[in-house]
């Protein structure tokens, strides 16, 4: 008897791809054959094949924000992508198709529905993307990382790394700490210019004895400028291009200052760490603000728009924080974690395949 087959569709950004890879790993451990529909010229082309997963090529990308000329080409590009997707599905004949977001998922999902192949959709963000908003109408099951995102949606959470979920409870980690607060600043792999400029200036406004210990991840191309910014501010900080052991860094931190991508918010909850979210202001549909509110509305994190993140505000805000308060916020964040999201999404895919057989 041949192994059951799933076709995962996700592309464009790590926020779509990494959760899909987590589900893929669970299903492979259960004996499934996993293939991936994606654009080989985009990020999935770099991330998926090294994991031993075959990338089934489909070259399609969105036109939102690309101008009128690109919009005029959309019907032709979409028709071509749908024809390609139909052929790929006919060749593969998957038992179930999982759409994790990104424009490449749209033609594949539509063609899967037309072929009556079970379609499962998972939306990571608190505001659904364009592709998933449409595909949710065609899907057998609709899943999400946060509650209330899509009609018929089941909030199963976002898959996060096991090492974050395995961290001790915040009360255990924070116990016995003394001295300066430990602050971890993370701008993502490419860094975040607003954090790289504002945090050093804010710390310079604090009395030296009141300054926290800072580990600041900036992205490789921004590291020299960040080091210069701290030097000019007269502030000591551990500046890094990347942090290989993010779980360890979060475990040591009293406070995390970061963006609010879906995976970041889910990782904050999984780790149980106090966080100040500064959403990227140009995210489509301002979805990072909605992501951050999942925790901030529950007093399990703080949310500060970038437009009002001034050095003066941040210095005053940091000066008011205590380790006891941060521990309480971290504990509330941990209560919102859904550590078995990848396994639960895999369960749904298996159920959809069985019901169709």
Curated annotation (Swiss-Prot):
It catalyses: di-trans,octa-cis-undecaprenyl diphospho-N-acetyl-alpha-D-muramoyl-L-alanyl-D-glutamyl-meso-2,6-diaminopimeloyl-D-alanyl-D-alanine + UDP-N-acetyl-alpha-D-glucosamine = di-trans,octa-cis-undecaprenyl diphospho-[N-acetyl-alpha-D-glucosaminyl-(1->4)]-N-acetyl-alpha-D-muramoyl-L-alanyl-D-glutamyl-meso-2,6-diaminopimeloyl-D-alanyl-D-alanine + UDP + H(+). Pfam families: Glyco_tran_28_C, Glyco_transf_28. It is a peripheral membrane protein. SUPFAM superfamilies: UDP-Glycosyltransferase/glycogen phosphorylase. CDD domains: GT28_MurG (cd03785). It is found in: Cell inner membrane. Its EC number is 2.4.1.227. It is an enzyme of class 2 (transferase). Coiled coil: none annotated. The keyword Manganese does not apply. GO terms for biological process: carbohydrate metabolic process; cell division; cell wall organization; lipid glycosylation; peptidoglycan biosynthetic process; regulation of cell shape. UDP-N-acetyl-alpha-D-glucosamine binds at residues 13-15, 125, 161, 189, 243, 288. Pathway: Cell wall biogenesis; peptidoglycan biosynthesis. Keywords: Cell cycle, Cell division, Cell inner membrane, Cell membrane, Cell shape, Cell wall biogenesis/degradation, Glycosyltransferase, Membrane, Peptidoglycan synthesis, Transferase. GO terms for cellular component: plasma membrane. GO terms for molecular function: UDP-N-acetyl-D-glucosamine:N-acetylmuramoyl-L-alanyl-D-glutamyl-meso-2,6-diaminopimelyl-D-alanyl-D-alanine-diphosphoundecaprenol 4-beta-N-acetylglucosaminlytransferase activity; undecaprenyldiphospho-muramoylpentapeptide beta-N-acetylglucosaminyltransferase activity. InterPro entries: GlcNAc_MurG, Glyco_trans_28_C, GlycoTrans_28_N. The keyword Cell cycle applies. Cell wall formation. Catalyzes the transfer of a GlcNAc subunit on undecaprenyl-pyrophosphoryl-MurNAc-pentapeptide (lipid intermediate I) to form undecaprenyl-pyrophosphoryl-MurNAc-(pentapeptide)GlcNAc (lipid intermediate II). HAMAP family: MurG. Belongs to the glycosyltransferase 28 family. MurG subfamily. This is UDP-N-acetylglucosamine--N-acetylmuramyl-(pentapeptide) pyrophosphoryl-undecaprenol N-acetylglucosamine transferase.
């Amino acid at each position: 008897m041949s192994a059951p087959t799933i076709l995962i569709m996700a592309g464009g950004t790590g926020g779509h791809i990494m959760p899909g890879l987590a589900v893929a790993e669970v299903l492979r451990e259960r004996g499934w054959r996993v293939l991936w529909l994606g654009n080989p010229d985009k990020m999935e082309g770099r991330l998926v094949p090294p994991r031993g997963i075959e990338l089934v090529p489909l070259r399609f990308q969105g036109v939102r924000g690309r101008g009128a000329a690109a919009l005029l080409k959309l019907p032709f590009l979409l028709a071509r992508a749908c024809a390609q997707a139909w052929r790929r599905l006919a060749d593969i004949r998957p038992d179930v198709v999982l759409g994790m977001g990104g424009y490449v998922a749209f033609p594949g999902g539509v063609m899967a529905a037309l072929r009556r192949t079970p379609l499962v959709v998972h939306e990571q963000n608190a505001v659904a993307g364009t592709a998933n908003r449409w595909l949710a109408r065609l899907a057998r099951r609709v899943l999400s990382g946060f509650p209330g995102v899509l009609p018929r949606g089941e909030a199963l959470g976002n898959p996060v790394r096991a090492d974050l979920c395995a961290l001790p409870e915040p009360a255990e980690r924070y116990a016995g700490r003394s001295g300066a607060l430990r602050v971890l600043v993370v701008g993502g792999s490419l860094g975040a210019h607003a954090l790289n400029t504002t945090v050093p200036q804010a710390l310079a406004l604090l009395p030296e004895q009141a300054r926290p210990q800072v580990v600041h991840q900036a992205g490789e191309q921004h590291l020299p400028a960040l080091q210069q910014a701290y030097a000019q501010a007269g502030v000591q900080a551990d500046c890094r291009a990347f942090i290989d052991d993010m779980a360890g860094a979060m475990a040591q931190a009293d406070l995390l200052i970061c963006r609010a991508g879906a995976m970041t918010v889910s990782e904050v909850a999984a780790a149980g760490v106090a966080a100040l979210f500064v959403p990227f202001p140009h995210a489509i549909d301002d979805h990072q603000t909605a992501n951050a509110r999942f925790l901030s509305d529950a007093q399990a994190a703080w949310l500060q728009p970038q437009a009002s993140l001034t050095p003066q505000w941040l210095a005053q805000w940091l000066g008011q924080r205590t380790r006891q308060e941060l521990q309480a916020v971290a504990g509330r964040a941990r209560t919102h974690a859904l550590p078995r999201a990848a396994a639960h999404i895999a369960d749904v895919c298996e159920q959809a395949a069985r019901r169709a057989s």
